[in-house]
Each structure stands twice: as C-alpha cells, then as structure tokens.
Regions:
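Active-site-flanking alpha-helical
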Residues: 80, 166-167, 199
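A generic structural-conservation signal
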Residues: 37, 155, 179, 198-199
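A short, terminal or domain-edge coil/loop segment
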Residues: 86-96, 141-148, 168, 201-210
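GST-like domain detector, emphasizing the conserved glutathione-binding G-site
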Residues: 1-126
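GST-like fold's C-terminal all-alpha helical module
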Residues: 100-191
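Short, solvent-exposed turn/loop segments enriched in Gly/Ser/Thr/Pro and often Arg
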Residues: 41, 158, 202-203
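Long hydrophobic alpha-helical segments typical of transmembrane helices together
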Residues: 182-210
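Residue-level signal for well-ordered alpha-helical positions
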Residues: 82, 111, 173, 201-202
Length: 210
C-alpha cells in the first residue's frame, strides 16, 4: 500500500531539509515504503479538509489506508512499527525518539526562531547567549552519552533518525563544533542513502516551486 504524505508546497526552509516532513520521508526511504505527496500551501493548512487531518493545521500528516496521523514523531513511530529496520531491538532505545522531539528540539527551535525573528530587538544578544547556553548543555549531555559510538543505542534506529534531523537545524550556528563526535554523528546520518533520497525529493519540490 502506498502512503500519502502532506508536505509544504513551498517550504519556509528553502529546501534545506529542515521541515518536519523530511523526517517522514527519510523514515519511508529507510524501510522502502512507497509514498505519494500531497503538497499544501500555507492557506490550505487552514482549511477544514486539512484541519480534519491535523487539528493544529501543521505538516506533516500521513494517510495509511483509513488511518490518518499527524505529528512527525507519531508518524515515524508508526512507520517503524510496521516495517523492519527502524524499530530499536532494545525498548529503552525507543526513548531517543521522544528525547529528540521533547528534550532536544524545543531549545534548538527557540534558538532558531530567536535568530530569525529577534535580531532587531535590543535584548537579542543577551537572549541568544542564554539560548546558546541551554542548547550547549543538551549537546554536552548528548555528546557524553554517544561517546565513540556510531549510533545512540547500537544499530541505527528511528531514535537516531529523529535526533540527527533535530541537530541539523544547528548547522551554521557553530554550536556543534565543540562536540566533534556529534558532528561526525550528524554526518553519518546525512551519508545514509535513504537520507540522501529523501533530501533530494524534498529539494525537488522546493525547486519546482521557485
């Protein structure tokens, strides 16, 4: 069965692979699951037809037959549960899926929004420095856990997929530079052929819209 993914018609990240549909694309490429894409404009996200799929009017959503899912973490978990190759053998390793979106992502996203929207504010430098410290604390904790390992819990799993995608938002910030093992970790994720196929697919959508 082919899944249907809802993604941005014109992604605000300008095709850099940071929108959350990228996580879902990557997961489907990892397990070899065919999918179709429904492209949505920002206006379409506000319409009743989309709100019936995603109550918060966001992307991504995924349709698997009669099942409709929203939230990227829930979608990636669904894919991992239904296909071999992404679900961790060790149940504890599943925690990394939720750590990525519940612990790592919030301060990283807050920093990203500050850098994007608050540069002209008088408090910008002080606030950015505070957010940098918060993010670096989490990076230090993650770095110590990873150590010299390739992946967080043995073999590559959905937890690594989610974590790598969250960390990619720090590219260009310099915050990963103090943690060489995390830089290498992200590079390993990007080097996976499934990631590269997913990135190319979302990039093609952006280029077609510009």
């Amino acid at each position: 069965m082919t899944y249907t993914l809802t993604a941005f018609e014109r992604s605000p990240d300008r095709g850099r692979g940071l929108a959350r549909d990228m996580r879902v694309r990557w997961a489907m490429e990892e397990v070899g699951q065919p999918y179709e894409v429904r492209l949505a404009s920002f206006d379409a996200l506000k319409q009743p037809s989309h709100l019936a799929r995603s109550p918060f009017g966001q992307i991504p959503t995924l349709e698997d037959g009669d099942l409709v899912l929203f939230e990227s973490g829930a979608i990636v978990l669904h894919i991992a549960q239904r296909h071999s190759g992404l679900l961790p053998v060790d149940e504890r390793a599943m925690a990394w899926m939720f750590a990525a979106i519940g612990t790592l992502d919030p301060p990283i996203m807050e920093r990203s929004m500050c850098a994007l929207l608050e540069r002209d504010q008088p408090w910008y430098a002080q606030r950015l420095a505070m957010l940098d410290r918060q993010v670096d604390t989490r990076l230090g904790q993650l770095s110590r856990w990873l150590g010299d390992a390739d992946w967080l819990e043995g073999a590559f799993s959905a937890g690594d997929l989610m974590t790598v995608h969250v960390l990619l938002r720090l590219r260009g910030s310099g915050l990963l530079d103090a943690h060489p093992n995390l830089l290498a970790y992200v590079a390993r994720g990007e080097a996976r052929s499934a990631y590269q196929r997913a990135f190319a697919a979302q990039r093609a959508v952006f280029e077609a819209a510009t």
